[in-house]
């Protein structure tokens, strides 16, 4: 819940309080604890999946997706092997803009991906620029993101859709 969180402080590390008064929370944060928010935070923590298991699942999906995407003529994978497994960035050279593919995927297949990089909505991605990608590649890049809810079947549908779109629009 908004307004509630946890802070883990390594032994020996001293932090200064942001507000003063009261002796609660080892003099770091004064005030009355918000019990409903704390209960909500506890419920959110309990709802978290096993992070190791989730990371393994996502890593497997990423490897599966990359193997399928590499087989599609007309797709180049921008993401390096050491990139986050939660995201794959691809480039389709035959399209003038990534927006064309985005719209086609969402309107006709119910598949939602993004363009550019997550940290650069509406402007050139500093992440893709730092990867030394050209402006053309950056403009035509698509970002595929994974969550714990995705399956190999989702990836198969995406790859089928991308193949269809590339065939349908040989050059736009």
Functional labels for PLM-detected ranges:
Residues 1-172:
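Pyridoxal 5′-phosphate
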């Amino acid at each position: 819940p908004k307004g509630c969180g946890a802070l883990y402080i390594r032994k020996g590390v001293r932090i200064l309080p942001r507000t003063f008064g009261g002796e609660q929370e080892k003099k770091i944060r004064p005030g009355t604890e918000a019990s409903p928010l704390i209960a909500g935070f506890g419920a959110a923590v309990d709802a978290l999946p096993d992070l190791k298991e989730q990371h393994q699942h996502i890593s497997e999906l990423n490897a599966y997706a990359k193997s399928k995407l590499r087989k599609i003529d007309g797709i180049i994978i921008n993401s390096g092997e050491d990139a986050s497994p939660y995201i794959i960035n691809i480039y389709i050279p035959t399209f003038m803009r990534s927006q064309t593919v985005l719209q086609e995927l969402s309107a006709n297949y119910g598949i939602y991906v993004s363009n550019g990089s997550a940290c650069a909505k509406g402007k050139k991605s500093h992440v893709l620029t730092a990867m030394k990608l050209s402006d053309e590649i950056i403009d035509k890049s698509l970002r595929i993101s994974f969550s714990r809810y995705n399956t190999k079947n989702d990836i198969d549908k995406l790859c089928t859709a991308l193949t269809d779109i590339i065939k349908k629009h040989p050059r736009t």
